[in-house]
Amino acid sequence: SGTTLKALMNTSKINKDIKGGNKLLENWPKGAGTNETTLKVLLSTFGFQLESVQREAPVLGKIENYTVKLKRPENGRKSNYKHPIAAFGSEAEEKGFRVICLFGKTDASRLIDTFKEVGNAKHTLVLLDYALPLAERRILARKTKTDLSGKIFAVVDRVVLVYLAKHYTETAMNRMLMAVIMPFASYQPYIDKSVDIMPQEIFIGRKYELEKIESPTGINIVYGGRQLGKSALL
């Protein structure tokens, strides 16, 4: 109580990372909401490559609500996402995800009730201007898996914010964000039907073959039997 967010920062880091951590704190929605410009800076500092951030009508008439789309590479290549969460990666290039802002003291049960009211039309990143206690965080981890279905509700609260600001590393930030918030959310990233499109985030292996296909002087015919990964490579 009475301690500012900046006072909790680690001052032993290199200057560039200190600036990045400070930028997270400066653009965090505090009490009275945010706007498109500030949210763009915050999400970019979290490591998202943004195409657009669009303010939508408030959810339930009171909850700040934004639609975020990520940028596709202009050269036709695939984005190099450093985490396996397609909902906040390649899938968001086309479908986007939602950001909502919540303020003030709460608990896991109230959060789950709010998420149900908001609805599961989109995967949702929740910016919560409150520090969830550890016990409530554990309850939230359980309830997101038992009480919610279909879409992600991933919570970034003040605890997550300060942790990421103190350990800010520009090239690893998006991966760190996912590693910290996803254990307390529910998501099944794997594809169990071969007819479904495999997200690039979970395509592992075949690096040599992929490089040969992408090379201007490489191969231009891909062949093989059924279920051997031809479509995944392409």
How does the language model describe each region?
Residues 105-117:
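A short, acidic, amphipathic alpha-helical segment used as a generic capping/interface helix at domain edges
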Residues 1-83:
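Acidic-basic catalytic patches of nuclease active cores, encompassing PD-(D/E)XK
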Residues 175-227, 232-233:
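Walker A/P-loop-proximal flanking segment of P-loop NTPase domains
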Residues 99-103, 194-197:
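Glycine-rich phosphate-binding "P-loop"
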Residues 105-108, 132, 216-218:
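Short beta->alpha connector loops
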